[in-house]
Swiss-Prot record:
Region (Disordered): 287-316
PROSITE patterns from the UniProt entry: L_LDH (PS00064)
Family statement drawn from the similarity comment of this UniProt entry: Belongs to the LDH/MDH superfamily. LDH family.
Subunit structure: Homotetramer.
Binding of NAD(+), residues: V15, D36, R41, Y66, G80, A81, A120, T121, N122, T145
Species classification: Bacteria, Pseudomonadati, Rhodothermota, Rhodothermia, Rhodothermales
Subcellular location: Cytoplasm
Enzyme Commission identifier(s): 1.1.1.27
Descriptive protein name: L-lactate dehydrogenase
Gene: ldh
Length: 316
């Protein structure tokens, strides 16, 4: 018997809707199930997508309650509170989102205990850690989108700089999805040729130019938010990429947020390292052979993430 491929999305704001559109347009699943506290919003998004069904094929989309997620193989968590006022602290916002996620995890452990969870709400690394702490499912089955988007931005900018298809660029940003993230220059390559300190495709390595490229990738969200008020399109594609890797058991190596479990001397935190992603979620970790400087920067990133949740309290 052929099993229907079912994807759930909890939270139909800008990011959840962009993810639904990306998956719908790519026909990644048999059905996409949308759930939101604002049920009419979820219904409206499902209706809007279904009006394009004839153009993409037999995929269906509908608004549901938690019980309907029982057959979902993978569920995206894109719900979250927005800042209530300019005076609200980052910790205050994080505290409210942590409480929202606690309620979500209670429902998902009850109705969809076997589903892979993909966390997309920011701060994604801290919320991925919270989900792993609260959920009864194995940690490997809870991933965060992490630095996959940062890495995509990084490769796109490097591809533009060197005049090649970004898919021919192999370079990672690891660690926190945020200010402490780390560019991995030591093994960044184009066509197998290392970039750092080398002349590639007629372009010499210039430290200042490369630092600028990294900073553009790291700070891209701020620039986009300044212009359009939010980010959604690219992160929607990133979520679809992870969903495809899981549903099709692709065994892709992707920088997603998970627990290093002692790798690089890091524990008790979620951050992005290269992982093999397949049907079971995070199936293996890959050690890309970081330089001593990069390893220390990754440990600094882990410390920053631990500090960010130091005063957080989440009931169980």
């Amino acid at each position: 018997m052929i099993q229907r491929r079912t994807v759930g999305i909890v939270g139909t704001g800008n990011v959840g809707t962009a993810a639904a559109y990306a998956m719908f347009n790519q026909s990644l699943a048999s059905e996409i199930l949308l759930l939101d506290q604002d049920t009419r919003r979820a219904e409206g998004e499902a209706m809007d997508l279904m009006h394009g069904q004839q153009l993409v094929g037999g995929i269906t989309c509908r608004a549901v309650e938690y019980a309907a997620l029982s057959n979902a193989q993978i569920i995206v968590l894109s719900a979250g509170a927005s800042q209530q006022s300019p005076d609200e602290t980052r910790l205050g916002l994080l505290q409210r989102n942590a409480e929202i996620f606690r309620e979500i995890i209670i429902q998902l452990d009850k109705h969809a205990p076997n589903a892979i969870l993909v966390v997309a709400t920011n701060p994604v690394d801290v919320l991925t850690y919270i989900c792993q702490e609260l959920s009864s499912r194995p940690n490997r089955r809870i991933l965060g989108t992490g630095t996959l988007l940062d890495t995509a931005r990084f490769r796109a900018l490097l591809g533009r700089h060197y005049g090649v298809d970004p898919r021919s660029v192999h370079a990672y940003i690891l660690g926190e999805h945020g200010d402490s993230e780390v560019p991995i220059w030591s093994n960044a390559t184009i066509g197998g040729q290392k970039i750092r300190g080398e002349t590639v495709l007629g372009k010499e390595w210039e430290e200042e130019a490369m630092q600028s490229i990294f900073e553009q990738a790291r700070d891209a969200a701020y620039e986009i938010i300044d212009r359009k008020g939010h980010t959604d399109t690219a992160i929607g594609l990133v979520i679809a990429r992870i969903v495809r890797a899981v549903l099709e058991d692709q065994q892709n190596v992707l920088p997603v947020s998970t627990r290093p479990d002692g790798a690089y001397g890091i524990d008790d935190v979620c951050l992005s390292v290269p992982c093999v992603v397949g049907l079971e979620g995070m199936e293996k970790r890959v050690d890309p052979g970081l330089s001593d400087e990069e390893r220390e920067a990754l440990r600094d990133s882990a410390r920053a993430l631990r500090d960010s949740r130091a005063d957080l309290t989440v009931g169980t």
